[in-house]
């Protein structure tokens, strides 16, 4: 039986936020993805307005779980059947306000639907990341001696950014300037690294290639060469997915949008222990998962 908010085992309620400068303790963070919040009518298994209540429940758990930060992996909002910029920004403001009720640092990863009828600049102006990550689409931060890298694959194959629906969602791409930045970030090999991205990087697996970053075959070798990548956390594919290659776990989280309340939701508390083993404590549709560090 899957954990629900009422049945979850929570840690001490205070404090809800732990500063990231302590050693020899686990790093703990909350994670959600693919909320697709809007007020449009349900479509298939997607209940767009209900993600507000789903997120409220997730944030309630996060605020009682002694977390270092919370991150969402993209597609935070959606749009109406007829795209309207102002209406879409209203949806973004509403869901961002709820996201920011977490009592600690929050971070965003951009997804393709975040630019369906607005620009990246619009998204950045209506959301906030913690600290130096604010107003950036790709960035890194360090928490308890672990480096976290956020990537932005929301670009067309010619390198131009996704902008107000000017894109084919099956052709995500990480442009050269970001690849060079990533190479610089990975030069230092003194810390374990975790990657966050919306579209999938495990193009080598059995997953549909339309869900993957088009130049993933260029990015993955950079990660493998570093030798310290613990895992890649991904969204985009609402059904979830998992693969493993060359000591790197690729975990795709199930989308929060899927399924009707009160029986459906998807969020997790992730813990990375001092030995760099990862435990995903999933709620509702999100299963528990251990991503253990394999040393050779």
Each PLM stretch: what is its role?
Residues 1-19:
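N-terminal export signals
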Residues 20-86:
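N-terminal active-site segment of His-dependent metallophosphoesterases
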Residues 27, 68, 138, 146, ...:
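Alpha/beta-hydrolase fold active-site loops
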Residues 31-33, 70-74, 106-112, 194-197, ...:
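Active-site neighborhood of phospho(di)ester-bond hydrolases with catalytic His/Asp-centered motifs
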Residues 35-38, 76-79, 112-117, 154-157, ...:
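Solvent-exposed loop/turn segments at secondary-structure junctions
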Residues 82-188, 218-229, 243-282, 294-295:
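Extended active-site neighborhood of metal-dependent phosphoesterases/phosphodiesterases
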Residues 187-204:
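Short acidic, glycine-rich surface-loop motifs adjacent to enzyme active sites
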């Amino acid at each position: 039986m899957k954990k629900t908010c009422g049945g979850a085992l929570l840690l001490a309620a205070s404090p809800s936020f732990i500063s990231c400068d302590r050693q020899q303790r686990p790093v703990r963070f909350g994670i959600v993805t693919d909320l697709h919040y809007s007020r449009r009518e349900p479509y298939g298994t997607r209940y767009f307005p209900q993600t507000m209540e789903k997120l409220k429940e997730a944030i309630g758990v996060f605020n009682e779980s002694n977390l270092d930060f919370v991150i969402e992996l993209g597609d935070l909002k959606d749009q109406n059947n007829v795209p309207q910029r102002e209406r879409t920004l209203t949806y973004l403001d509403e869901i961002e306000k709820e996201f920011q009720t977490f009592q600690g640092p929050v971070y965003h990863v951009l997804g393709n639907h975040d630019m369906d009828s607005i620009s990246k600049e619009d998204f950045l102006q209506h959301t906030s990341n913690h600290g130096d990550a604010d107003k950036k689409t790709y960035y890194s931060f360090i928490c308890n001696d672990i480096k976290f890298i956020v990537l932005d694959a929301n670009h067309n194959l010619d390198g131009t950014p996704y902008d107000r629906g000017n894109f084919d969602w099956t052709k995500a791409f990480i442009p050269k300037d970001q690849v060079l930045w990533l190479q610089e970030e990975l030069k230092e090999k003194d810390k374990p690294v975790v990657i966050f991205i919306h579209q999938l990087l495990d193009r080598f697996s059995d997953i549909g290639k339309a869900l993957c970053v088009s130049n993933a075959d260029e990015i993955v070798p950079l990660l493998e060469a570093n030798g310290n990548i613990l895992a890649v956390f991904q969204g985009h594919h609402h059904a979830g997915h998992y693969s493993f290659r060359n000591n790197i776990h690729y975990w795709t989280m199930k989308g929060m949008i899927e399924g009707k309340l009160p029986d459906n939701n998807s969020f997790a508390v992730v813990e990375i222990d001092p030995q760099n083993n990862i435990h995903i404590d999933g709620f509702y549709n999100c299963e528990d998962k251990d991503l253990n560090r394999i040393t050779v």
